Each structure stands twice: as C-alpha cells, then as structure tokens.
C-alpha cells in the first residue's frame, strides 16, 4: 500500500519469514507483480562455505516464499571468529553464489561490508566478479 518495492533483508536479521508473508500479501491481495519488486538477502557468517551456503540459500528462499532472488550477498568478509582461513571460506562461499547465479536462481551476486583486499581476492579466485559491494 505504501509503494515500497525494494526490500533488503538478511538471514541474520531474522525477518525473512515476515518479509515473505508481506510479499505474498502484496502479490496476492494487492496485485503487485513479483517483477516489480527487488528483493535482496544475505548469507550469515555461520553458514559460509559451499554446502552450507547452498543450504542457507534454500532456507532463505523457503522463508521468503520466492522462486528467485534479485540479489544475494555475503554479509561480511570471513573473520577469525568464524573461520581460520578467510580467503578459502570466501572462495568456497563465492563458488556457491556463482552456481546459484548460473542456475538463474539469483539475478545478481555480491558482497556486503567487504574491504578492497577481500573483493580483490574474490575477483582473483572466482569466475564472476562481485556485482555489488553494499557498505553499511
């Protein structure tokens, strides 16, 4: 009703299910077309790495009730608290992002709060460059 069309959420915000319910109401009750919406979410630090990232994506999609995502972001660069080797965990997470993008499940992939050396490592290690670096 208010006209919002851009929704930025994250696994860590714990509101994906609520947003999904709002999107469902907008589409079904108000006639808003899914194509008119831009929805982004982010994978949390504890769900990093290839397999965990794919599972986290599926869970986010289930909560959001969507068939595709407009933008998927790695929420934070890996830090020692969560992972010993930041470059390797970013690389394996990014491989999962590239797969989701190639499969058409995500229209754009990127990162959030990454410093220049983190982005540089992804461009060196991956096939697809990050399309967005969302800075807090």
PLM-predicted stretches and their roles:
Residues 10-18, 46-51, 80-81:
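Acidic-and-aromatic substrate-binding clefts and catalytic sites of carbohydrate-active enzymes
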Residues 1-37, 67:
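N-terminal binding-site loop/beta-alpha segment at the start of enzyme catalytic domains
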Residues 76-136:
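Beta/alpha (TIM)-barrel catalytic core signal, keyed to glycine-rich beta->alpha loops juxtaposed to Asp/Glu
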Residues 10-12, 42-46, 74-77, 114, ...:
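Active-site beta-loop-alpha junctions enriched in small/polar residues
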Residues 1, 49-65, 115-121:
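Short, acidic/polar
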Residues 25-35, 64-66, 101-105, 125-129:
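Short helix-capping segments at alpha-helix termini
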Residues 53-74, 99-103:
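CE4/NodB-like, metal-dependent polysaccharide N-deacetylase domain
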Residues 7, 19, 39, 60, ...:
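Conserved, mostly hydrophobic/aromatic
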């Amino acid at each position: 009703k208010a006209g919002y069309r851009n929704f930025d959420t994250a696994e860590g915000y714990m509101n994906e299910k609520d947003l999904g319910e709002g999107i469902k109401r907008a589409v079904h009750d108000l006639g808003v077309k899914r194509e008119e919406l831009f929805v982004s979410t982010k994978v949390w630090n504890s769900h990093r790495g290839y397999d965990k990232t794919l599972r986290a994506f599926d869970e986010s999609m289930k909560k959001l009730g969507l068939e595709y995502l407009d933008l998927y972001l790695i929420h934070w660069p890996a830090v020692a608290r969560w992972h010993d080797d930041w470059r390797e965990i970013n690389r394996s997470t990014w491989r999962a992002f590239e797969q989701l993008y190639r499969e058409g499940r995500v229209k754009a992939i990127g990162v959030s709060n990454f410093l220049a050396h983190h982005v540089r490592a992804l461009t060196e290690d991956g096939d697809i460059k990050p399309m967005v670096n969302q800075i807090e």
